[in-house]
């Protein structure tokens, strides 16, 4: 029981230490979430929004299995976008 409490205290201390000592080029841990999506410099930079898509007659994998999708307006037929 004492060992568990000591481990919890140690983890909390190390987490706090990491946050305090984090190097931030903007002089501190400033409001990371204060800007709205419209105010961001490059909202298109998100990797989630930039998915590679395959053109017509290019190889594709069924979306349930893989991460290669056909471009909008096309569907993944038997291993090719049509």
Swiss-Prot record:
- Report the SS bond pairs: 53-71, 60-76, 70-81
Highest taxon of source:
Eukaryota
> What main location does UniProt list?
secreted
Q: In which tissues is it expressed?
A: Expressed by the venom duct.
Where it sits in the cell: the answer is: Secreted
The reply to whether Nucleotide-binding figures as a keyword in the UniProt entry is: no
Asked if Cell cycle is a keyword of the record, the answer is: no
List the signal peptide residues.
1-22
Transmembrane ranges, per UniProt, are none
Q: Single GO cellular component annotation?
A: extracellular region
- InterPro entries linked to this entry: Conotoxin
Q: Which UniProt keywords apply?
A: Calcium channel impairing toxin, Disulfide bond, Ion channel impairing toxin, Knottin, Neurotoxin, Secreted, Signal, Toxin, Voltage-gated sodium channel impairing toxin
Sequence similarity:
Belongs to the conotoxin O1 superfamily.
| Domains (record comment) | The presence of a 'disulfide through disulfide knot' structurally defines this protein as a knottin.
Quote the protein name from its UniProt record: Mu-conotoxin MrVIA
User: From which source organism is this entry?
Assistant: Conus marmoreus (Marble cone)
